[in-house]
C-alpha cells in the first residue's frame, strides 16, 4: 500500500528488455534505499514493483508484459526520472489517500498551464470507460501522486499541482502529449460498480 506522497525521484540507469518482461535497474537517492530489503514493494510512477536485487543504492525490478502495456513504464528510457514511494508501514501518516499501486491505464496530458504558485494539468483518459469513476473533488492518483480532481469537461479532467509537488516530482519534466499512469480511487470504483450492478439487477427483475 502507498499514500501518493512521493518520497523522491530516481533515475533509470539500465533496461534489460526480454520477450515477456523488462528488467529495470534504478539508482535511488540514499535516503530511499535505507533499510530496503529484497522482496519489498516500491512504487515506480505509481506502479507497485517488487525489489529483486539490491546493490548499495541500485535496485533491480522486473516489469511484466501486462504492466508494460497498461502503464508508461514501457516507454521509459535510460536516464529518465521516475517518482518513487516506499510502501507504508503500520503507524505511518497517510498524507494523501490509500493507493494499491495497481495502475489501471494511462492518460495523456492535453494542456499544462503554469504560474508562480500553481500548475493546472488537463488529462484525457486513453481508456474512456474509466471516466465514470472521475468525480469533482474526488481522489485520483497520477504517476503515483495523490491529487484531487478540480474540474471535469466532457472527456477530460484537470488537477492542480502545488509548487512543492511540481519541483520534487517528475511533473516538472512533463509536457503536452506526455503519458501518465492513472489509478482510480478504490472506494470510488467500488461504489460506482456496486451501484451500477444493483440498478442493472433491479431493472432486470422488472422485466423478468
Swiss-Prot record:
Pathway: Cofactor biosynthesis; riboflavin biosynthesis; riboflavin from 2-hydroxy-3-oxobutyl phosphate and 5-amino-6-(D-ribitylamino)uracil: step 2/2. Coiled coil: none annotated. 2,4-dihydroxypteridine 2 binds at residues 48-50, 62-67, 101-103, 137. Lumazine-binding repeats lie at residues 1-97, 98-195. It catalyses: 2 6,7-dimethyl-8-(1-D-ribityl)lumazine + H(+) = 5-amino-6-(D-ribitylamino)uracil + riboflavin. It comes from the Bacteria. GO terms for biological process: riboflavin biosynthetic process. GO terms for molecular function: riboflavin synthase activity. Keywords: Repeat, Riboflavin biosynthesis, Transferase. It is an enzyme of class 2 (transferase). One of its GO terms (cellular component) is cytosol. Its EC number is 2.5.1.9. Disulfide bonds: none annotated. PROSITE patterns: LUMAZINE_BIND (PS51177). Gene3D superfamilies: 2.40.30.20. 2,4-dihydroxypteridine 1 binds at residues 4-6, 146-148, 160-165. Catalyzes the dismutation of two molecules of 6,7-dimethyl-8-ribityllumazine, resulting in the formation of riboflavin and 5-amino-6-(D-ribitylamino)uracil. Homotrimer. PANTHER family: RIBOFLAVIN SYNTHASE (PTHR21098:SF0), RIBOFLAVIN SYNTHASE ALPHA CHAIN (PTHR21098). NCBIfam families: PRK09289.1, PRK13020.1, ribE. This is Riboflavin synthase. The lineage of its organism: Bacteria, Pseudomonadati, Pseudomonadota, Gammaproteobacteria, Enterobacterales.
Amino acid at each position: 500500500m502507498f499514500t501518493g506522497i512521493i518520497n523522491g525521484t530516481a533515475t533509470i540507469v539500465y533496461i534489460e528488455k526480454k520477450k515477456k518482461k523488462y528488467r529495470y535497474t534504478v539508482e535511488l537517492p540514499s535516503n530511499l534505499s535505507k533499510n530496503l530489503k529484497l522482496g519489498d514493494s516500491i512504487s515506480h510512477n505509481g506502479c507497485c514493483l517488487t525489489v529483486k536485487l539490491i546493490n548499495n543504492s541500485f535496485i533491480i525490478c522486473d516489469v511484466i508484459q501486462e504492466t508494460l502495456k497498461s502503464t508508461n513504464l514501457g516507454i521509459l528510457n535510460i536516464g529518465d526520472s521516475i517518482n518513487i514511494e516506499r510502501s507504508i508501514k503500520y503507524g505511518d501518516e497517510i498524507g494523501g489517500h490509500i493507493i494499491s499501486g495497481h495502475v489501471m491505464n494511462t492518460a495523456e496530458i492535453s494542456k499544462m498551464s503554469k504560474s508562480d504558485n500553481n500548475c493546472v494539468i488537463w488529462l484525457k483518459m486513453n481508456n474512456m470507460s474509466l471516466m465514470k469513476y472521475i468525480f469533482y473533488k474526488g481522489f485520483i492518483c497520477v504517476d503515483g501522486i495523490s491529487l484531487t480532481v478540480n474540474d471535469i469537461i466532457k472527456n477530460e479532467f484537470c488537477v492542480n499541482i502545488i509548487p512543492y509537488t511540481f519541483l520534487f516530482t517528475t511533473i516538472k519534466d512533463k509536457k503536452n502529449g506526455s503519458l501518465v499512469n492513472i489509478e482510480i480511487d478504490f472506494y470510488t470504483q467500488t461504489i460506482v460498480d456496486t451501484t451500477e450492478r444493483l440498478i442493472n439487477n433491479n431493472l432486470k427483475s422488472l422485466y423478468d
